[in-house]
């Protein structure tokens, strides 16, 4: 998919088209007032106050028609520079623009505006030369958005759109968007019965249905078994803690905006935890440790809660409560490289076995100029960042450095993936931390009997299970590998009167093998039942008629398409082997 923020020409084109849309809206609704209209990864949007008018699907064609009329007129897009006083006078009737102007830096004495015909907007640019260049556009959708993202403010109307240089490119992109909608985990999750949301329960609080929780448990067991084979130990800690825990860790200072409000419980203050590391630090300090005990790899599938604005929530990809595939490796400085390599190796192994191919590595470093966000210790940061660079270079892994993206306590390696809709997301992470062990005064005894501070490696191979499931549903288009499918086999007798007994026999044999099987023997026509199973993306459908019953065979449909015939015994061996080997294909 194109990224309109990263391509300068597409950025300028979509920026200008946002102004074109605003101009058209102003023509149709003269009282309209405008907040901001930025370029985003998938095009642009503009937040608009239309008073009592609510934009509906029926209004979009009229706006597009007016946009085409303005574009055909071909006015030049002209930049002006005015003083702050002139800007305040120009936009005196628009409270949203006044707010932008008044919040500008005091040293910003010159303000830029862009005009096209009868429309002028505050803007830094860039833009194309004329509105005629914006003729190949499409308005995509509309929604509500709180002014400034604050739920206490008025809801503005947000209209999304996209613009491409040619009609052919626009049509191709719109086709990509349609395909992306089909891959969106929110659609697939509904079709497959993975999870549900309820406003009564709360926004961003997913509830996993039987199919979803089956998938969850399979992934959890898979990653836990991987960790056990690599010497991890698993623990369980509570999903909240005393506020002093987060003062000690520094989360309250550096991460408070992402935390839920503090709760008063009798004479103590508690908070829902946003991360698990403070609990694991305390757990490490429960015992005395020798260098012989290290590395100590403490892992947990842990429940966390983070405050996310309602506008940022997205299915189960971005939620307010989630379970993290977390681990903290306590090690000596000499063990950093081998442990870090072990984590990267595990990430690559898991991705290979799950068939995840499209990803990239990003090395997130601190911004040395930021004295607020990061723990201040230049020697520690330089050592940590160089260690991670050395490991990645030794492994021959291509990576991109991201300045200012590190955690407050240390640099990190993130694995980025592209979901069907929206921005890139982090799937896996590995972070080096010299800071938290010092904050919690953690120690181990070295071979000379001296007390030393361990290093901590934070890592999450699948990130959060919620996000991993969301991404994997999109990556596979819902066609999960057999071993991960909530329902692996659906048995469909053609006629219950004649074929149900044979169908029940097969169901029992499959259950004895540990295969998740359903009997689809409703009174509906066979074609309807098959379509039903196709929508649910059940990997294997067994259609049983007279021939299959009489010859003790089965007719398989694999992912609703390829058809095979086998004896019953051959099929039982086949499906068990595919399941046990965690095969990606059928």
What are these regions (language model features)?
Residues 1-35, 39-586:
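NTP/phosphate- and nucleic-acid-binding module
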């Amino acid at each position: 998919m194109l990224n309109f923020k990263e391509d300068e020409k597409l950025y300028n084109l979509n920026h200008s088209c946002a102004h074109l849309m605003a101009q058209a809206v102003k023509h149709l609704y003269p009282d309209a007032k405008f907040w901001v209209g930025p370029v985003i990864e998938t095009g642009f949007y503009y937040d608009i106050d239309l008073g009592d008018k609510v934009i509906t699907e029926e209004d979009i064609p009229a706006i597009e028609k007016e946009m085409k009329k303005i574009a055909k007129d071909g006015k030049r897009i002209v930049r002006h520079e005015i003083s702050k006083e002139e800007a305040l006078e120009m936009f005196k009737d628009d409270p949203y623009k006044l707010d932008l102007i008044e919040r500008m830096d005091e040293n910003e004495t010159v303000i830029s505006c862009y005009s096209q015909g009868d429309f002028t907007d505050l803007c830094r640019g860039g833009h194309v030369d004329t509105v005629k260049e914006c003729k190949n556009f499409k308005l995509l959708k509309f929604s509500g958005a709180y002014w400034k993202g604050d739920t206490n403010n008025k809801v503005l109307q947000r209209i999304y759109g996209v613009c491409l240089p040619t009609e052919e490119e626009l049509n191709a992109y719109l086709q990509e968007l349609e395909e992306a909608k089909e891959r969106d985990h929110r659609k697939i999750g509904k079709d497959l019965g993975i999870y549900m949301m309820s406003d009564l329960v709360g926004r961003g609080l997913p509830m996993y249905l039987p199919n979803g929780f089956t998938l969850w448990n399979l992934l959890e067991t898979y990653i836990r078994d991987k960790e056990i084979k690599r010497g991890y130990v698993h623990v369980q800690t509570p999903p909240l803690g005393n506020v002093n825990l987060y003062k000690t860790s520094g989360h309250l200072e550096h991460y408070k905006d992402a935390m839920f409000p503090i709760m008063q419980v009798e004479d103590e203050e508690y908070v829902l935890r946003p991360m698990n590391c403070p609990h694991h630090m305390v757990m490490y300090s429960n015992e005395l440790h020798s260098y012989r005990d290290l590395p100590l790899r403490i892992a947990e599938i842990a429940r966390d809660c983070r405050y996310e604005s309602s506008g940022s929530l997205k299915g189960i990809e971005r939620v307010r409560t989630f379970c993290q595939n977390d681990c903290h490796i306590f090690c000596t400085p000499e063990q950093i490289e081998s442990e870090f390599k072990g984590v990267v190796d595990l990430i690559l192994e898991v991705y290979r076995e799950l068939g995840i191919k499209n990803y990239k590595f990003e090395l997130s470093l601190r911004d040395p100029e930021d004295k607020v966000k990061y723990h201040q210790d230049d020697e520690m940061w330089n050592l940590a960042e160089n260690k991670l660079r050395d490991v990645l270079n030794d492994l021959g892994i291509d990576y991109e450095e991201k300045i200012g993206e590190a955690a407050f306590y240390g640099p990190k390696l993130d694995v980025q993936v592209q979901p069907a809709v929206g921005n890139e997301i982090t799937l896996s992470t590995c972070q080096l931390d010299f800071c938290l062990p010092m904050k919690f005064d953690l120690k181990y005894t070295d071979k000379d009997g001296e007390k030393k501070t361990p290093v901590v490696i934070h890592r999450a191979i699948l990130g959060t299970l919620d996000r991993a499931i969301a991404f994997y549903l999109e990556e596979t288009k819902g066609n999960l590998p057999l071993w991960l499918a909530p329902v692996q086999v659906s048995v469909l007798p053609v006629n219950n009167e004649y074929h149900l007994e044979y169908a029940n026999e097969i169901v029992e044999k499959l259950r004895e093998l540990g295969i998740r099987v359903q009997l689809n023997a409703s009174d509906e026509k066979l074609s309807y039942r098959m379509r039903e199973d196709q929508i649910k993306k059940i990997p294997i459908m067994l259609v049983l008629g007279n021939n299959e019953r009489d010859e003790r065979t089965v007719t398989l449909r694999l992912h609703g398409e390829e058809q095979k015939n086998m004896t019953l015994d051959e099929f039982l061996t086949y499906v068990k082997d595919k399941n046990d080997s965690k095969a990606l294909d059928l």
